[in-house]
């Protein structure tokens, strides 16, 4: 008699694109604690060139990355490529106008740094499990 093997259900992949090294290390760890898979990239270009583009189910994206394509530029590039990936923007800019603009452009959420772990968890859950 053989034992039934448990069915392994792949965990959704959340990709983090941020030029800040500390966030590139801490956010994927936090996402993994939520029970998801995570990958981090130092630039939009690195994300676009990666093998993870097609696997990504949610993108946590810094708005401003001076040495690379900006978060909104990456959002437009994904749209141009017809990639429908829910995006959670993170920004140090506390300007509500920018936040509202990003939400109007299709972002799931725009979190102002510093944000709570709970706020990020809620945004990731909303992105991966829309009502």
Description of each model-found segment:
Residues 69, 73, 94-109:
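Alpha4 helix (beta4-alpha4-beta5 surface) of REC/receiver domains from two-component response regulators
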Residues 97, 115-125:
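C-terminal output helix
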Residues 21-39:
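Two-component/phosphorelay signaling modules centered on CheY-like receiver
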Residues 45-46, 70-83:
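Short amphipathic alpha-helix used as the core "switch/output" element in two-component signaling
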Residues 11, 55-57, 81-86:
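His-Asp phosphorelay/catalytic-motif detector in bacterial-type signaling
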Residues 40-58:
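Acidic, metal-coordinating helix/loop segments flanking the phosphotransfer/catalytic sites
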Residues 65-66:
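Receiver (REC) domain active-site loop signature in two-component systems and cognate sites
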